[in-house]
Amino acid sequence: MKLDPLTVPRFTGIIVFLIVSTWAFPMSSTAQAEIQSLEFPYFTLRNRTGSPEPGDAYGGERSDLKAGLCRVEELDLGVLAPLADLAPNFLLEELLRVQDVQELDIATVLEGLAASAGERGPALYVHGYYIGFEKGCRRAALFQQNADLSGRFLWFSWPSDGAAAYYTHDEADLYWSLPDLADTIIKLEQRFGSKNVDVIGHSLGARGVILALAEVANRDPDIRLGHVVLLAPDVDFGIFERILPRIAPIAESITIYATTGDRPLALSAQLHGYPRLGEAGNDVSGLTGVEVIDLSDLPSEGPTGHLYHIYSRAVGEDLRRLLNAGERADGRQGLVVQSENVWRLRPTARE
């Protein structure tokens, strides 16, 4: 896509950062193939802003459930495009722009998803803290691409403020969103069938998934979902231990991705006073039936260690094998068993 006047300041900043980052991070990108244009459906509880800019179509206020399609495209860097190939992975989202947002009724979105998802059914993804709508669209596009979820992907965007200082406000908005998230999971299972709906949550969004699943299990104990994936889950480890027996029966599998180098989770543990589920090193032997993937051997894909699901090729490939091929941890290439329910993911040759 070509630049418009509103994009020029951001474009200039990107160019400067590209030049600096190629000096500071000389390793080439290991991300998946380029995103030229990618469209996916969304559900959101955000308010309409009335802005003509697609990325600003929704704000951070609470509202009723809406649905539609979001299209993300690459910025056209012209002759400077080769610099992007040398830039670190965590810069990739800055090379994307939300080009179009089309709001549709929920039934139309579900019909389109049914036509594109195939036999596996949809994969519902819930984002985490500090995610405005525009940033969320860009990261959702990267995650869909990295995990190869095209056609299956459905993004659930709750009204995070998109501001680093508003963590507790985001927590409140997440809890407010839980009934609609639970309703969405139930309706998807009713539409697509038993074990045909995968549910994925990242960071604070993983906490939302866990709590919503507890409500789903209470309301409909006979429901059967597919794979539940918790990426860098920002949730009290002890609370998850107590909730697990309630949600395990309704999921085909539950997989946790954790690492020792996750800085936001370390800060969350200090804030809350208890270890987080996404921190490697917890005693997970009592998490019966849960598969834990330890990513501590992977190289850092960014300054936070929190976004491996969108930047690490190895994590993307492991997710693809789990979510698309249905392979359990003991059969997936690249995993080395550590204990009864813990595997370490080895980096690929290109990471």
Q: Where in this protein do the model-derived segments appear?
A:
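Bacterial N-terminal signal peptides that target proteins for export
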Residues: 2-14
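Lipolytic serine-hydrolase domain surface
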Residues: 34-118, 137-196, 213-227, 232-351
